[in-house]
Amino acid sequence: FGYGVGLDLTRRDLQAAAKAKGMPWDTAKGFDHSAPASELVPAAGAGDLVTRRLWLTVNGDLRQQSSLDDMVFSVSEVIHELSKLFALKAGDLIFMGTPAGVAALVPGDRFEAGVDGLVAFSGHIA
């Protein structure tokens, strides 16, 4: 098991259409390439997961940042609670939430996301 960082993208057009029909909006979260993510750092080498800074830049501008200890639940609490409900296995991804600053990404945007001292990755929106 390990830790990384990723983007949990939402297609707002699909979300709005589903909401208007009173339907679940799973398709707005599960489209192709909807969850770009970094490589994983083995849990044994991850160190402190309480006070590290989580951040996102878009086109070189800082859009989101927060300390992991500002999250509603800690990483260990989320894993503990989910493991009561699901058999967590290698390959499962758990997205923890996001700091303030959520905004649309548009084709051509370049992003970089990371957790200080742990991992970072970059990509672009096609």
Regions found by a protein language model. Give the residues of each.
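Catalytic-core "active-site belt" of small-molecule-metabolizing enzymes
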Residues: 1-89, 93, 101-126
